[in-house]
């Protein structure tokens, strides 16, 4: 049996929670992703705890708790300034929506609880003394960099179809490979993904897409035909096949969506709908549209100063990132340096505003907006000094 001697602070801080449960006569373990990441020497953000205590028994032991998912056996305990999800050992049955169990049964056996988990590398538990409980050779799979379903993969994916996306996502994040039977079960059951909400799929897709091994994971995503069951990808395998051959993997979500849109050759008028279909936020959609617009511009010609100003620093940098990933030559340093050298970089930095123009006899309306934009363009391109006096003289000369 493996024993971990040196534990990160996140586990040490949670030890009194396990000790409290054990002192009351219950079993308690750290479980799941935190144990996996500990053994992989990855940063552990938070820990999950599983116990033989029923939810009401957990609540009696701790002064502060929240019923976060009490029907399914989960109580959040507030302790030492941290919150800990504590879930009773359980088995599950009946998955009519291919996502959540219809019935949860509390059990007194850790083994039964671990059997219901998705992958061997996530079906690991650790006790108070750092002893690892490994019923399904998860530690061996960690060593061999393998994602393998616990037990029968078909059964696991029928219980929760999102697990198919999670499997591919883990290959990207962890740089692991899919075990043969697990991959075959995804190929045989990929259509079940249609039963899952787009929001859930999107979350896994983004994690897959910006993971360090995303190009290889994307190839699995295509080969297993999961790509046929997500918004707007059906029948587009040939276009998307370029993704695994990209120069680099994207590390930003904006870059990921921009790359997908470019590969799909979506016209500008379809971008907003595509982003909505994937349940992206308006802010994300706006950022991606700006990147695509600037990417098209730099693909066509070298931008002038005002075009750099209109794009803004973040869009310029993000677009350069996309161009590099696609292997498109772009004078990145020159573009950024030129932007940083602009007389003004934001509309608010202009020395005057619309009220200044009104004070000088201009009526509110389209002409005022046009004049303000013209002044801004002249200032940005260093053809007009950014001062009220210089702008006032420019207005007088117009008259």
Curated annotation (Swiss-Prot):
Cross-referenced InterPro entries: Bact_CCA-adding_enz_type3_sf (IPR050264), CCA-adding_enz_C (IPR032810), CCA-adding_enz_firmicutes (IPR023068), NT_sf (IPR043519), PolA_pol_head_dom (IPR002646), PolyA_RNA-bd (IPR032828)
GO MF annotation: an example: ATP binding
Record-annotated membrane-spanning stretches: none
Q: Could you tell me which species this protein originates from?
A: Lactobacillus helveticus (strain DPC 4571)
PANTHER family recorded:
CCA TRNA NUCLEOTIDYLTRANSFERASE 1, MITOCHONDRIAL
The residues the record assigns to binding Mg(2+) are: 46, 48
Assembly notes? Homodimer.
Top-level taxon in the UniProt lineage: Bacteria
Q: Does the keyword ATP-binding apply?
A: yes
Report the gene name.
cca
Name the needed cofactors.
Mg(2+)
Protein name, UniProt field: CCA-adding enzyme
Signal peptide stretch: none
Record function comment:
Catalyzes the addition and repair of the essential 3'-terminal CCA sequence in tRNAs without using a nucleic acid template. Adds these three nucleotides in the order of C, C, and A to the tRNA nucleotide-73, using CTP and ATP as substrates and producing inorganic pyrophosphate. tRNA 3'-terminal CCA addition is required both for tRNA processing and repair. Also involved in tRNA surveillance by mediating tandem CCA addition to generate a CCACCA at the 3' terminus of unstable tRNAs. While stable tRNAs receive only 3'-terminal CCA, unstable tRNAs are marked with CCACCA and rapidly degraded.
Cross-referenced HAMAP family: CCA_bact_type3
Q: Does the keyword Metal-binding apply?
A: yes
Judged by the first EC level, this protein's enzyme class is transferase
């Amino acid at each position: 049996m493996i024993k971990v001697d040196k534990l990160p602070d996140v586990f040490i801080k949670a030890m009194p929670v396990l000790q409290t449960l054990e002192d009351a006569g219950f079993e308690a373990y750290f479980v799941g992703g935190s144990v996996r990441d500990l053994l992989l020497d990855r940063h552990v953000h938070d820990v999950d705890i599983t116990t033989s205590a029923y939810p009401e028994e957990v609540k009696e032991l701790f002064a502060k708790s929240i019923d976060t998912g009490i029907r399914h056996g989960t109580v959040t305990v507030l302790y030492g300034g941290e919150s800990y999800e504590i879930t009773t050992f359980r088995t599950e049955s009946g998955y009519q929506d291919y996502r959540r169990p219809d019935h949860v049964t509390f059990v007194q056996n850790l083994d039964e609880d671990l059997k219901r988990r998705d992958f061997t590398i996530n079906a690991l538990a650790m006790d108070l003394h750092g002893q690892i409980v490994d019923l399904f050779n998860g530690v061996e799979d960690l060593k061999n960099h393998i994602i393998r379903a616990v037990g029968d993969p078909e059964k696991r994916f029928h219980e929760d179809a999102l697990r198919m996306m999670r499997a591919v996502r883990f290959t990207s994040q962890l740089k692991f490979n899919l075990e043969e039977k697990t991959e075959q079960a995804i190929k045989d059951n990929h259509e079940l993904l249609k039963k899952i909400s787009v929001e859930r799929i999107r979350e896994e897709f983004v994690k897959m897409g910006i993971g360090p091994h995303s190009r290889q994971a994307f190839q699995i995503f295509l080969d297993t035909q999961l790509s046929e069951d997500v918004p707007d990808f059906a029948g587009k395998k040939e276009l998307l096949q370029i993704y695994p051959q990209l120069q680099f993997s994207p590390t930003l979500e904006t870059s990921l969506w921009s790359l997908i849109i470019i590969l799909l050759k979506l016209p500008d008028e379809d971008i907003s709908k595509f982003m909505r279909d994937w349940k992206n936020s308006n802010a994300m959609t706006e950022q991606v549209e700006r990147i695509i617009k600037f990417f098209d511009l730099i693909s066509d010609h070298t931008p002038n100063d005002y075009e750099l100003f209109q794009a803004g620093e973040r869009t310029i940098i993000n677009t350069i990132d996309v161009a590099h990933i696609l292997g498109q030559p772009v004078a990145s340093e020159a573009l950024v340096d030129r932007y940083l050298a602009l007389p003004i970089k934001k509309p608010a930095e202009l020395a005057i505003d619309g009220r200044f123009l009104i004070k000088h006899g201009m009526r509110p309306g389209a002409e005022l907006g046009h004049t303000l934009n013209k002044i801004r363009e002249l200032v940005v391109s260093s053809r007009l000094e950014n001062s009220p006096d210089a702008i006032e003289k420019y207005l007088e000369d117009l008259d």
